[in-house]
Every structure is written in C-alpha cells, then in structure tokens.
C-alpha cells in the first residue's frame, strides 16, 4: 500500500528530528570533551606555572640564604682580623716597652757586665772559629774588653782549641741601640747577633705562645704550641 504524502512528510520529519537529535548529542559530546580537554590543559598549564613560580622563589630564597651566609662569614672574618690586629698591636706595644726598659739594664754597670760576659761567651761558642771579631757600641768598649778577656780562657778550656778574639776598632754598633754585641768570624762573612734587642726578639719569639696565653687565654682551636 503506497504511503500518502502526509505519511511521507511525517516520516521525513521523524527522520529529521532523529538526525537533529543525534547531531545535537554529538555536538554536546564534542563540546563536553573539548571542555574537559580544555580544563585538563588549563590545569596542566596552571600547575606548570605554579611549579615554575615555586621553583623561582625557592631559588631566590636559596640565593638570599647563601648571600646571608657569605655576608655573615665575611663579617666574622673581619671581626676576627680586627681582634688579631688588636692583639698583635698590644704585643708589639709590650715588646716596644720592653725594649725601652733595656736602657735601665745598661745603666746598672755591674748587671750589664755580667750580661755582656754571657753574651760574648755564648757568641764564641756559636761560631767556634779560630779567629773572631767582637763589635760593640763605642761606649761599651771597656766592658766588652773585660768580657772578652774573661771569655777566652773559658772558651779554650771548654773547646780545647786556641782562639784569637779581637774587638772591632774600625766599626762600632749604633749608639741608639740598647747594647750587647755582634760577633763575626775572621772574614766577617758569618755573624752572630747578640745585641740586647736581638736577644729580646728571640726570647719573645720563643715565648710567644706563653705570652699570648697569658694575655688572651688558651686557644681552644690550637693543638700544638710554637
């Protein structure tokens, strides 16, 4: 039985409605999927940027912390250097004061003579040369001459060697030093400095750990003494 025009139109409308509905559903599905992908991508981008921002500020924070440590280390080093300089200045002042007091030793002739006797004899023992020359301040000549005369027989007995010891009459030690002697071998190429200043410097160097300990206390970081 043939369909009437009305039936045909009705079926066409029904098919059109079905196609339209399916198209709408497909479009909605595409929109939903697109929105889902968009949200996923947006979330990924947001998370990526968030991580980048966090990483940036963490890096900045580490840089600032490192700069703080460096600045603190520099400040501590500067403070430590200031303390060391102040300590060295104090020790230098004490040594200078001690050198100034050496003049008092020289004024006591008896005491100074005993000191010269020891310095001359010690210098002879250090050189152990067959011929030696003793140099002194011009004003100390009589005392040094007496010291040399005492030292020669003591040296000969101790070393069992003959020796020729002369006092330098061509050159004297500067008058502005505290005193003491310098002793040379025969050709003046080897010298033993036994001036009062050189002896004080030697003693100060040998006793520096004790001096520092007495002034500033023991150094907890130091394992050995000089």
Swiss-Prot record:
The modification N-acetylalanine is found at residue 2. GO terms for cellular component: apical plasma membrane; clathrin-coated vesicle membrane; cytoplasm; cytosol; endosome; extrinsic component of synaptic vesicle membrane; microvillus; vacuolar proton-transporting V-type ATPase, V1 domain. It is a peripheral membrane protein. One of its GO terms (molecular function) is proton-transporting ATPase activity, rotational mechanism. The modification Phosphotyrosine is found at residue 56. Keywords: Acetylation, Cell membrane, Cytoplasmic vesicle, Hydrogen ion transport, Ion transport, Membrane, Phosphoprotein, Synapse, Transport. InterPro entries: ATPase_E_C, ATPase_V1_Esu. It comes from the Eukaryota. It is found in: Apical cell membrane; Cytoplasmic vesicle, Secretory vesicle, Synaptic vesicle membrane; Cytoplasmic vesicle, Clathrin-coated vesicle membrane. Pfam families: vATP-synt_E. Expressed in brain (at protein level). Its main location: membrane. V-ATPase is a heteromultimeric enzyme made up of two complexes: the ATP-hydrolytic V1 complex and the proton translocation V0 complex. The V1 complex consists of three catalytic AB heterodimers that form a heterohexamer, three peripheral stalks each consisting of EG heterodimers, one central rotor including subunits D and F, and the regulatory subunits C and H. The proton translocation complex V0 consists of the proton transport subunit a, a ring of proteolipid subunits c9c'', rotary subunit d, subunits e and f, and the accessory subunits ATP6AP1/Ac45 and ATP6AP2/PRR. Belongs to the V-ATPase E subunit family. Subunit of the V1 complex of vacuolar(H+)-ATPase (V-ATPase), a multisubunit enzyme composed of a peripheral complex (V1) that hydrolyzes ATP and a membrane integral complex (V0) that translocates protons. V-ATPase is responsible for acidifying and maintaining the pH of intracellular compartments and in some cell types, is targeted to the plasma membrane, where it is responsible for acidifying the extracellular environment. This is V-type proton ATPase subunit E 1. The lineage of its organism: Eukaryota, Metazoa, Chordata, Craniata, Vertebrata. The gene is Atp6v1e1.
């Amino acid at each position: 039985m043939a369909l009437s025009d009305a039936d045909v139109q009705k079926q066409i409308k029904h098919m059109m409605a079905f196609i339209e509905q399916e198209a709408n559903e497909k479009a909605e599905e595409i929109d939903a999927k697109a929105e889902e992908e968009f949200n996923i991508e947006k979330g990924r981008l947001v998370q990526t940027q968030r991580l980048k921002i966090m990483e940036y500020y963490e890096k900045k924070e580490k840089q600032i912390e490192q700069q703080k440590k460096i600045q603190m280390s520099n400040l501590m080093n500067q403070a430590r250097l200031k303390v060391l300089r102040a300590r060295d200045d104090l020790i230098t002042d004490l040594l200078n004061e001690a050198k100034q007091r050496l003049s008092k030793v020289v004024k006591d002739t008896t005491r100074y003579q005993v000191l010269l006797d020891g310095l001359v004899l010690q210098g002879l023992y250090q050189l152990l040369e067959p011929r030696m020359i003793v140099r002194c301040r011009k004003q100390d000549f009589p005392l040094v001459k007496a010291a040399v005369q005492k030292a020669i027989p003591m040296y000969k007995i101790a070393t069992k060697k003959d020796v020729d010891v002369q006092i330098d009459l061509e050159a004297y030690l500067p008058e502005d030093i505290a005193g003491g002697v310098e002793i040379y071998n025969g050709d003046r190429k080897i010298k033993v400095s036994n001036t009062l200043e050189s002896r004080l410097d030697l003693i100060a160097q040998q006793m520096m750990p004790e001096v520092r300990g007495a002034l500033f206390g023991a150094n907890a970081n130091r394992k050995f003494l000089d």
